[in-house]
């Protein structure tokens, strides 16, 4: 991902304030609610029968935290996202058979959740930088797909 020095600084500064536990669970939960077909990849998560069930599900929250911890690693390696996410790409492609379009959807949901949490601090410039990052991460995660 090509970011200017200002964009990198904006992304890093905001990310330092993110509560990964809270935002991760909320982002994954919103993905599962807004795009219910994505739930098929989470059969082992138990009750996903309603928005309240999804948002209160401890397995959704735990996996959301795991997802954002991986995203944090990506932010530390913006110049090598493909390398950073190579193993996760392989796992999601070969073993889990996740539709790579879902990575884009989750990235966009994450941007919305960040905007909701940070309000005016999430300026158009910060949003534009995050859109670049989530697009880069989605591309890296889709890299192993043929």
Swiss-Prot record:
Red blood cells. The modification Phosphoserine is found at residue 44. Keywords: Acetylation, Heme, Iron, Metal-binding, Oxygen transport, Phosphoprotein, S-nitrosylation, Transport. The modification N-acetylvaline is found at residue 1. The modification S-nitrosocysteine is found at residue 93. GO terms for molecular function: haptoglobin binding; heme binding; hemoglobin alpha binding; metal ion binding; organic acid binding; oxygen binding; oxygen carrier activity; peroxidase activity. Transmembrane segments: none annotated. The modification N6-acetyllysine is found at residues 59, 82, 144. PANTHER family: HEMOGLOBIN FAMILY MEMBER, HEMOGLOBIN SUBUNIT BETA. Involved in oxygen transport from the lung to the various peripheral tissues. Belongs to the globin family. This is Hemoglobin subunit beta. It comes from Mustela lutreola (European mink).
């Amino acid at each position: 991902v090509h970011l200017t020095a200002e964009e990198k600084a904006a992304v890093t500064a905001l990310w330092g304030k993110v509560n990964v536990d809270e935002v991760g669970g909320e982002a994954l939960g919103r993905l599962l609610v807004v795009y219910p077909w994505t739930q098929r990849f989470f059969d082992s998560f138990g009750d996903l029968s309603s928005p309240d069930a999804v948002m209160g599900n401890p397995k959704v929250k735990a996996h959301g935290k795991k997802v954002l911890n991986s995203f944090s690693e990506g932010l530390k390696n913006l110049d090598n996202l493909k390398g950073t996410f190579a193993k996760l790409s392989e796992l999601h492609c070969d073993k889990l058979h996740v539709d790579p379009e879902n990575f884009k959807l989750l990235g966009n949901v994450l941007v919305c959740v960040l905007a909701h949490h940070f309000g005016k601090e999430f300026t158009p410039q910060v949003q534009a930088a995050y859109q670049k990052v989530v697009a880069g991460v989605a591309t890296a995660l889709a890299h192993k797909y043929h």
